[in-house]
């Protein structure tokens, strides 16, 4: 079965952004931050390649296309999703919006970590240890850090709100400087 994925570029004061959506389910499946358009698109292509390598046994193939191929109904939906995403990035609305996420990669544990992370409101931070307790597994701190490092839907899954136990900003795929900027914008630090 063939699945269409569509990408769009956005610009924001904090970072250049590329989002990838699945129009058939109206879901956000991937976000990359910072870098040039070619780098961001390269990140998306690597993501789709990994999804395809894990999905081919199931008979699924994902194809990545520019948003220009969309029909007008889908363009309106994508424009709304893009607007909502930029509002989250700007700290204007919380990540618990009507942006539907679909995880094309990830174990059940990772997906549980990501869903729990989505509940952390803008302006708040918690430690990896606190997140482990929320998940009912206080000893899973390293596993949680690993799961967050594999988060493919930055900002909407707000892994930037997870900090070290002593309040130190640690681990963010797109850089500690961007993590700090996001938290300052949300008035969390």
UniProtKB/Swiss-Prot annotation:
Annotated CDD domains: ATase
Residues that hold DNA according to the record: 128, 142, 165
Reactions catalysed: a 6-O-methyl-2'-deoxyguanosine in DNA + L-cysteinyl-[protein] = S-methyl-L-cysteinyl-[protein] + a 2'-deoxyguanosine in DNA; a 4-O-methyl-thymidine in DNA + L-cysteinyl-[protein] = a thymidine in DNA + S-methyl-L-cysteinyl-[protein]
InterPro entries: MethylDNA_cys_MeTrfase_AS, MethylDNA_cys_MeTrfase_DNA-bd, MethylDNA_cys_MeTrfase_DNAb, WH-like_DNA-bd_sf
SUPFAM superfamilies: Methylated DNA-protein cysteine methyltransferase, C-terminal domain (SSF46767)
Signal peptide (residue range): none
The protein's Enzyme Commission number: 2.1.1.63
A GO biological-process term: DNA repair
Gene Ontology molecular function, alphabetical: DNA binding; methylated-DNA-[protein]-cysteine S-methyltransferase activity
EC top class named in words: transferase
PROSITE patterns, per database record: MGMT
Disulfide bonds: none
Location of the protein in the cell: Nucleus
Gene3D superfamilies, per database record: Winged helix-like DNA-binding domain superfamily/Winged helix DNA-binding domain
Positions annotated as active site in the UniProt record: 159
Keyword Methyltransferase in record: yes
Entry coiled-coil feature ranges: none
Family to which this protein belongs: Belongs to the MGMT family.
Xref: NCBIfam families: ogt (TIGR00589)
Function comment: Involved in the cellular defense against the biological effects of O6-methylguanine (O6-MeG) and O4-methylthymine (O4-MeT) in DNA. Repairs the methylated nucleobase in DNA by stoichiometrically transferring the methyl group to a cysteine residue in the enzyme. This is a suicide reaction: the enzyme is irreversibly inactivated.
Misc remark: This enzyme catalyzes only one turnover and therefore is not strictly catalytic. According to one definition, an enzyme is a biocatalyst that acts repeatedly and over many reaction cycles.
Name recorded for this polypeptide: Methylated-DNA--protein-cysteine methyltransferase
Organism: Kluyveromyces lactis (strain ATCC 8585 / CBS 2359 / DSM 70799 / NBRC 1267 / NRRL Y-1140 / WM37) (Yeast)
Gene label: MGT1
């Amino acid at each position: 079965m063939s699945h269409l994925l569509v990408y769009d570029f956005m610009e924001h004061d904090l970072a250049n952004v590329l989002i990838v959506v699945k129009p058939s389910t109206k879901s956000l499946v991937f976000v990359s931050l910072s870098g040039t358009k070619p780098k961001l698109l390269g990140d998306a292509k690597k993501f789709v390649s990994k999804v395809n390598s894990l999905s081919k046994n199931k008979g699924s193939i994902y194809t990545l296309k520019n948003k220009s191929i969309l029909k007008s109904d889908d363009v309106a939906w994508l424009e709304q999703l893009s607007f909502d995403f930029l509002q989250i990035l700007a700290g204007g609305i919380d990540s618990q919006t009507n942006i539907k996420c679909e995880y094309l990669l990830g174990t059940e544990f990772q997906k549980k970590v990501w869903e729990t992370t989505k509940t952390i409101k803008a302006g708040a931070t918690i430690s990896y240890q606190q997140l482990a307790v929320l998940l009912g597994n206080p000893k899973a701190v390293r596993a949680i850090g690993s799961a967050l490092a594999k988060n493919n839907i930055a900002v909407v899954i707000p892994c930037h709100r997870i900090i070290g136990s002593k309040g130190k900003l640690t681990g963010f795929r797109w850089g500690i400087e961007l993590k700090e900027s996001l938290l300052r914008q949300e008035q969390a630090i």
